[in-house]
Amino acid sequence: MARTYLMENYQNYPFLYAKAYATLIQRLSAGDRVIVHCTAGKDRAGTAVAMVLTALGVPRDTVFEDYLLTNQYWDRGGRERPGMDPETVAQIFSAREEYLNAAFSAIEDRCGTVETYLKDVVGLDQTALAALRTACLD
């Protein structure tokens, strides 16, 4: 049940938060420093960072490697939940490749490519992408 819930959320994140991604990328393009966080730091924040890395041209396998680092660096204290089975707790508190893959699959199913998604849904044209890359990579 938790897995299904998370998979559905990840499929929706790129479309629910497209405006937030646009704002984040605009701020980064302007040279602003930002902090991206949420309760667990892997779902909404992880997807946002994955979209930024993708917009920067980072290879997909590297985007996934970065996302999965959450499992190494996130404080595992306090994960015990009375009344919840350990697998459910693990599903909720783990960054899993299948979750982020659900987001990218939803983008590709609806838009064809991530590039089309960034242009048509997030609103980033080639000029905006170039500004982001200049601000973050130069």
List the predicted regions and their residue ranges:
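Cys-dependent protein tyrosine phosphatase-like superfamily
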Residues: 1-35, 47-138
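Ser/Thr-glycine-rich phosphate-binding loops at phosphate-binding pockets of nucleotides
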Residues: 40, 44-45
